[in-house]
Swiss-Prot record:
<dbReference type="Pfam" id="PF01165">
    <property type="entry name" value="Ribosomal_S21"/>
</dbReference>
<dbReference type="InterPro" id="IPR018278">
    <property type="entry name" value="Ribosomal_bS21_CS"/>
</dbReference>
<dbReference type="InterPro" id="IPR001911">
    <property type="entry name" value="Ribosomal_bS21"/>
</dbReference>
<protein>
    <recommendedName>
        <fullName>Small ribosomal subunit protein bS21</fullName>
    </recommendedName>
</protein>
<dbReference type="GO" id="GO:0003735">
    <property type="term" value="F:structural constituent of ribosome"/>
</dbReference>
<keyword id="KW-0689">Ribosomal protein</keyword>
<keyword id="KW-0687">Ribonucleoprotein</keyword>
<feature type="compositionally biased region" description="Basic and acidic residues">
    <location>
        <begin position="31"/>
        <end position="42"/>
    </location>
</feature>
<comment type="similarity">
    <text>Belongs to the bacterial ribosomal protein bS21 family.</text>
</comment>
<feature type="region of interest" description="Disordered">
    <location>
        <begin position="28"/>
        <end position="58"/>
    </location>
</feature>
<dbReference type="GO" id="GO:0006412">
    <property type="term" value="P:translation"/>
</dbReference>
<dbReference type="InterPro" id="IPR038380">
    <property type="entry name" value="Ribosomal_bS21_sf"/>
</dbReference>
<dbReference type="GO" id="GO:0005840">
    <property type="term" value="C:ribosome"/>
</dbReference>
<feature type="compositionally biased region" description="Basic residues">
    <location>
        <begin position="43"/>
        <end position="58"/>
    </location>
</feature>
<dbReference type="GO" id="GO:1990904">
    <property type="term" value="C:ribonucleoprotein complex"/>
</dbReference>
Length: 58
């Protein structure tokens, strides 16, 4: 969980930017999107092998 403490002279906008940046670095949104819908294990394997094949080709 990302946590940001707001300083005395810090604006809310800059604190929000820091929070968004820390969430992006932690991969929170990617994890939420990944778990948004259930994927069968066979489909996970298929996607993983396709990604490896694409990566190997380039």
């Amino acid at each position: 969980m990302s946590e940001v403490k707001v300083g005395k002279n810090e604006s809310l906008d800059s604190a929000l930017k820091r929070f968004k940046r820390s969430c992006q670095k932690a991969g929170v949104l990617q994890d939420i999107r990944k778990h948004e819908h259930y994927e069968k294990p066979s489909i996970k394997k298929k996607k993983k092998s396709e990604a490896a094949r694409k990566k190997k080709r380039f």
